[in-house]
Amino acid sequence: MGLSDIPANYMQQTGHNLQQQQLHHHHHHNHNHNHNAAAAAAAAAHVLAMENSELLMSPKDKMSSKKKMHLLKKIKKRFGLVRRSPSSCPGPNNLPPLQFHTVHGDNIRISRDGTLARRFESFCRAITFSARPVRINERICVKFAEISNNWNGGIRFGFTSNDPASLEGALPKYACPDLTNRPGFWAKALHEQYCEKDNILYYYVNNAGDVIYGINNEEKGVILSGIDTRGLLWTVIDIYGNCTGIEFLDARIYMYQQQQQQQQQQQQQLQQQQLPQQQLPQQQQQLPQQQLTAHHPLQQSRRSLPGGTGVVVDHELERHVMPSLQSLHLAGTAAGIIEHDLANGLPPLRYNANGRLIPVPFHITKGRNVRLSHDRFVASRTESDFCQGYVFTARPIRIGEKLIVQVLKTEQMYVGALALGLTSCNPALLQPNDLPNDSDFLLDRPEYWVVSKDIAAAPQRGDEIAFFVAPNGEVSISKNNGPAVVVMHVDQSLQLWAFLDVYGSTQSLRMFRQQLPNMVAYPSQPQINAAAAAAAAAASTTAASSRMLPMAESLNSLNAGQMLRSKMQLNVTQSSSTLASTAGNGSRMISMPSNGDILQIQPNGGGTVLVVNLPPRSSSHDLNGQLAGRQAASAATVTSSGILAGACSSGTLISTTSSQQYIEPVAQSTSTLNGTKWKDSLSDQQSTDSSAECTICYENPIDSVLYMCGHMCMCYDCAIEQWRGVGGGQCPLCRAVIRDVIRTYTT
């Protein structure tokens, strides 16, 4: 097809040549801008007036006004009043076709009137330029004419503000990074998967300096930014790797062909819609309505409002509210999640479908190469990059909470896989520049970071990786419901956010969580009366077993450094069903698994997570708490974070620095363990901790601090040996890499 085959109304008419347009643009920019704005406003008003008058015409007048409306359409296109289709050229189409410049690499041969460039001998020294400067928003179409399987990699393309004529005899081997390290050159590598024979690459630079590219008329997004558009720009292409020949296409012809194909497809779809509905299967007619009702039960009622008002849909409401309603609607049953996945083309959960699964949204803080879905449930890395795929959980994780990561898409061309990490850093405080390309460098940050790379070897689409943090700090991972493997240890007393690095072969994923068995919420500063609590406990003994504990000594935070006493009591009852209560503002979540061995306090507003191993219960427990009162003083233990947690044979006392409250687990009627053994083991542990002996040699006192984790568990000599390679140079408690050893002195 040539330019003569394109209708005249497709071309934009111009009365000046290219040089006159550029000269006029540079010297009379402001005048033309104001003149065009006024002309566009006048034309728009005239068009609207004629369209309104057409509605009042008779049928004969309408037939005679077709020519006028045809003229109006031309005016609309001329002044930009018609919305362009994605395939239409966004820039001027009255420019001559692009050709290759005579200045090029040593291994380049130009033919076909300067439109075809081939690379001979080797894989480098193949830099080419356009023969003329390109305009802003001018679409450049490149066809991959020849492909070789003897090389790897894809072409490099971009722009330069340097005249190629000034580079004759001074071209380097490669465009990236030889040219891009010089001022005035911008280029990026195209992914090798797009470099296939007869594929057509298009790209252009806009006024903001962003380079948008696409393949086969399908836009992929921005690949380059920061182009200086104040001067002339030439396109630069390095025919590198598996591509050995490229051809410049006339953008006008290519875009016209794409428009014709789209029009034909639209006509075919319109003809199919006009077929009698009796010929369509009944299931096919009912399927869209069933899907609409199943996935968005509120959407149908909003669209079917009387008076036609339901036709206008608030897109922002659908964009933000409907995904949340949908997740709430589907969170209760696994069948609802499977139905939703099948409707959206996502692989259903196969290995962890049992139980109550809740989709987990990702935090808005992410790596620069990650795209989140509108509901933030799906994270996808851009196809042209393999790193900077960080995503964080929107809230801190809870101890014992099972998180399930499902792989939605993979790309086997990349090496490496998904990485998992935990951090005490709030993602809201991070900037995109704070995240490195290699997740190992996160360990150099001042916050607490732990990372494990390649947690799933060679992941496939549909694989499910489940992980959770145990009360002892072990992080266990299982793939496809297989045996769990401990991959790292963390400081479980910290408030931790989980993060993933969508790296290497992993392209897209989403996350679910299984709700903990029992959740109790209580206000941060409750008003509790001892007499009222005792009366309430006596009244509730017939329904559930309960008990109260008196006051115990507690230490304030290390910053205050003084002893406080409190006589506040909190009565916690346990029934056979799941415990749940409504909390007000500033509430905290208490997680109590059904076995009653672990108690976890999760502050919603931030702070330290307190995890307590509950003591065994005895059937001869005193409900009045007299035994607890006698043993409370000897059972108190001060934690390193400044929070007091006491445990004894009769119960557990918990005190926080903010509210100074006591949380007590409920006694069970039967127990297979002996409370005396718990008391003895606790006393032994306290005596061991008080001696502060090195955990390696058990001879010298602890006199060193490990940097960066901050643990004090070894003497200085053992810490130096551990740091220099014995044990892998890791902290024996949290397995963090030891960066330095700091010696401490006591007086």
From Swiss-Prot:
GO function term, MF aspect, one: DNA binding
PROSITE patterns membership: NHR, ZF_RING_2
CDD domains in the cross-refs: mRING-HC-C3HC5_NEU1 (cd16647)
Keywords: Developmental protein, Differentiation, DNA-binding, Metal-binding, Neurogenesis, Nucleus, Repeat, Zinc, Zinc-finger
A cellular-component GO term for this protein: plasma membrane
Biased composition (Low complexity): 280-292
GO biological process entries: asymmetric cell division; compound eye development; germ-line stem cell population maintenance; imaginal disc-derived wing morphogenesis; long-term memory; mesoderm development; negative regulation of lamellocyte differentiation; nervous system development
Region Disordered: start-end pairs: 280-309
One Pfam family named in its UniProt record: Neuralized
Protein task: Involved in neurogenesis. Interacts with other neurogenic proteins in the specification of the neuroblast versus epidermoblast cell fate.
Entry protein name: Protein neuralized
